[in-house]
Amino acid sequence: MKICFEKNFECCNPCQPKCCPPPCPPKCCPPPCPPKCESICIDKCPNTCDPCCPPLVDDCLAKKLECLWRQCFCDARLIPEFGVPCQSDGVAVITHTLGRGLCNLKINGLKSQSILANNSFYSVEVSGCKWLNLYEIQLPDVPGKNGCKSSGEIYTEALVKLGISVEGDGYRWKGSQPYCLNIHSKAIGMHPIEFSKKQIAAIKAVLDYFFCDNKCCC
């Protein structure tokens, strides 16, 4: 399966038009950064420790990342206080669900609205003058048919192809329905914009393949 992460995350295996919602309206995204924020130099030297442009996670970059994630997951948001760099020692934390119909996990028959049960989490910071990207997903474990790969296999293989490390996977909650995998991924030295595009592409590869026929992904 071809995994793409350019051109606004166009589907490599597009689902029916009714399944794929239009991009989030402008009001969905934070206001543009003021000019002074452009010193982040995303394209000039994203992964180096050059004094002219050291890696930096500030509120401006955090808002850009929030807007990027909202293009595919309309409920993506920075977590107040400890997910906003100026209030959390330079750490940005974004959380989101996988979309309508894929959240509201039940635990032993009890429907949960908790972000601990339904949400995925992305954090980025600079440590040792290097980008440190960490991501954790709550992914429904859907078996493949007739020997085809499961949702977890497609997702983890997509991450590896895109240069993102899979750090471990397991199950978060016993007695949950649907049965969900809890998979961690990581990239050091990769600019958070690039990491986000690749991470979203891996998630979309799974959603488009398993879920878009019946459910709206956003």
Curated annotation (Swiss-Prot):
It is found in: Virion. Keywords: Virion. One of its GO terms (cellular component) is virion component. It comes from the Viruses. This is Uncharacterized protein L724. It comes from Acanthamoeba polyphaga mimivirus (APMV). The lineage of its organism: Viruses, Varidnaviria, Bamfordvirae, Nucleocytoviricota, Megaviricetes.
